[in-house]
């Protein structure tokens, strides 16, 4: 099986530019346990960060302006782009006089449930907080990130985590090393439509971290809905089921299988039919961005 990577575009880093990782994530399970009075659903999930993802290129501006170079996501205007919104959110929260140019080198498929937009936004918050010397602590940055999306805080904290609430109540977890065979079916189903689907299970019995550690398989609440609605997702899960326990990440449409070692994942990749958008990524013990930030002097 030949590997087919998501398309990426590379920028030549010139004077003043710096490059920063924005890792992808997987949801090792996801269930909905109820609905709050404000209409949001109560979730339980485990976030697993990956040692693979997008790259955010940043350059500090002295004139206070925020500019996006190119398009992070095709068709998304600059004002609606999460990376631009993240930069403005930090700027307004701190009254800093500086600005930034932002370029996103995309590898994470859009609409796949791999957390690309949220991770990109978190990287912008963390790195500009350092480059602008605004010195907000992680808890404050995570609170800002939550205003952009429920998945942003886990990337700000940069750790694998058990999550509850709308996904923002995090308990750090130490997960064993693993490698993942990922597959992008190439379809995007709006999350709102999935939450409105009458067949979605919204009243699962609450689980515990102990249940997860014991190996209880909870699955993903969105998987049966996606299977029914999208033949591409059903096909992807069926193909992956030939090599292991296939799961959906997030609200889809991305799918994955976990393996103990990268060699096992690579062997499984070779068994897939040619031409699929499939690749292998290692699980990370924590966000690679934190390691990069730790080595930098600001």
From Swiss-Prot:
ATP binds at residues 109-119. It comes from the Bacteria. Keywords: ATP-binding, Isoprene biosynthesis, Kinase, Nucleotide-binding, Transferase. The active site is at residues 25, 151. Pfam families: GHMP_kinases_C (PF08544), GHMP_kinases_N (PF00288). One of its GO terms (biological process) is terpenoid biosynthetic process. Transmembrane segments: none annotated. It is an enzyme of class 2 (transferase). InterPro entries: GHMP_kinase_C_dom (IPR013750), GHMP_kinase_C_sf (IPR036554), GHMP_kinase_N_dom (IPR006204), IspE (IPR004424), Ribosomal_Su5_D2-typ_SF (IPR020568), Ribsml_uS5_D2-typ_fold_subgr (IPR014721). Pathway: Isoprenoid biosynthesis; isopentenyl diphosphate biosynthesis via DXP pathway; isopentenyl diphosphate from 1-deoxy-D-xylulose 5-phosphate: step 3/6. It catalyses: 4-CDP-2-C-methyl-D-erythritol + ATP = 4-CDP-2-C-methyl-D-erythritol 2-phosphate + ADP + H(+). Its EC number is 2.7.1.148. One of its GO terms (molecular function) is ATP binding. PANTHER family: 4-DIPHOSPHOCYTIDYL-2-C-METHYL-D-ERYTHRITOL KINASE, CHLOROPLASTIC. NCBIfam families: ispE (TIGR00154). Catalyzes the phosphorylation of the position 2 hydroxy group of 4-diphosphocytidyl-2C-methyl-D-erythritol. Belongs to the GHMP kinase family. IspE subfamily. This is 4-diphosphocytidyl-2-C-methyl-D-erythritol kinase. It comes from Xylella fastidiosa (strain Temecula1 / ATCC 700964). The lineage of its organism: Bacteria, Pseudomonadati, Pseudomonadota, Gammaproteobacteria, Lysobacterales. The gene is ispE.
């Amino acid at each position: 099986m030949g590997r087919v990577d998501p398309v990426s575009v590379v920028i030549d880093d010139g004077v003043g530019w710096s490059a920063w990782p924005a890792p992808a994530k997987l949801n090792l399970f996801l269930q909905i346990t109820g609905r709050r009075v404000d209409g949001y659903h109560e979730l339980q999930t485990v976030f697993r960060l990956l040692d693979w993802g997008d790259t955010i290129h940043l350059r500090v501006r002295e004139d206070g302006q925020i500019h996006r170079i190119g398009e992070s996501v095709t068709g998304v205007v600059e004002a609606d782009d999460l990376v631009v919104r993240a930069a403005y959110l930090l700027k307004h929260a701190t009254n800093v006089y500086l600005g930034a140019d932002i370029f996103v080198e995309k590898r994470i498929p859009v609409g796949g449930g791999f957390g690309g937009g949220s991770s990109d936004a978190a990287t912008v918050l963390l790195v500009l907080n350092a480059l602008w010397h605004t010195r907000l602590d992680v808890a404050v940055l995570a609170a800002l990130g939550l205003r952009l999306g429920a998945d942003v805080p886990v990337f700000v904290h940069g750790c694998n985590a058990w999550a509850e609430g709308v996904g923002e109540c995090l308990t750090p977890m130490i997960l064993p090393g693993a490698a993942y065979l990922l597959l992008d079916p190439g379809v995007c189903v709006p999350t709102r439509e999935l939450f409105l689907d009458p067949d979605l299970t919204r009243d699962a019995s609450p689980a515990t971290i102990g249940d997860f550690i014991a190996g209880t398989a909870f699955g993903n609440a969105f998987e049966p809905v996606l299977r029914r609605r999208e033949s591409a997702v059903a096909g992807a899960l069926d193909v992956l089921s030939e090599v292991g326990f296939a799961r959906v990440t997030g609200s889809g449409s991305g799918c994955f299988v976990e393996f103990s070692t990268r060699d096992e994942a690579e062997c499984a990749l070779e068994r897939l039919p040619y031409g699929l958008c499939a690749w292998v990524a290692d699980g990370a013990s924590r966000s690679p961005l934190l390691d990069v930030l730790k080595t930098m002097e600001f």
